[in-house]
Amino acid sequence: MNIKANDARRPVSIVVIGAGNRANKYLEYAKINPDKVQLVGVVELNDIRRNKVAERFGLDASQCCSDYKTFFHNPVKSDAILICTPENMHFEPSMMAIRKGFHVLLEKPIAQTLEECIAIGKAAKEKGVIVAVCHVLRYHPYFMKIKELIDTEELGCLLYTSDAADEA
């Protein structure tokens, strides 16, 4: 399941766990870049979302699963697992993927506690797999402009910042 250096010319095969809004952003990339990324499986509790992804990528029933615990008993062969579950559900599927030898691309936060984060890191090191964390907004023009303003001190020397978002 590990990617070898001589495999660089083929697409990276992935299974996505959690097929909500964030996952669909990554899947847009996979759809327009099939030479780089190939979706080979979807794990999603919600039937409608799971079926929508399956239809969009031509996945059959053997490539779809309603829960990750069942999936990891007989996983679809792939290079990596993309974990896009809700924030409080990152640890267990990450550990299961690592134990099975998959590389993991994980939405932030890595886990809910420092101990869980350390456990993921240790398990990945022991198994020889890569765990990468998505920080995609750091390259969004909005945030790049903020970084530029801070770096140039155009607005003065920044001493403190606070942010709040309406989740509605």
Locate the predicted segments by residue.
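Oxidoreductase and adenylate-handling cofactor-binding alpha/beta cores
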Residues: 139-159
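Beta-loop-alpha module in the N-terminal Rossmann-like domain of NAD(P)-dependent dehydrogenases
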Residues: 62-123
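Rossmann-fold dehydrogenase core element
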Residues: 119-136
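N-terminal Rossmann-like dinucleotide-binding module
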Residues: 1-58
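Aromatic/hydrophobic pocket-lining residues that form π-stacking "cages" and hydrophobic walls in ligand
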Residues: 50, 93, 120, 146, ...
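Single conserved hydrophobic/aromatic residue that forms the stacking wall/gate
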Residues: 160-168
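Short strand-turn motif at the edge of the Rossmann-like AdoMet-binding core
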Residues: 108-109, 135-137
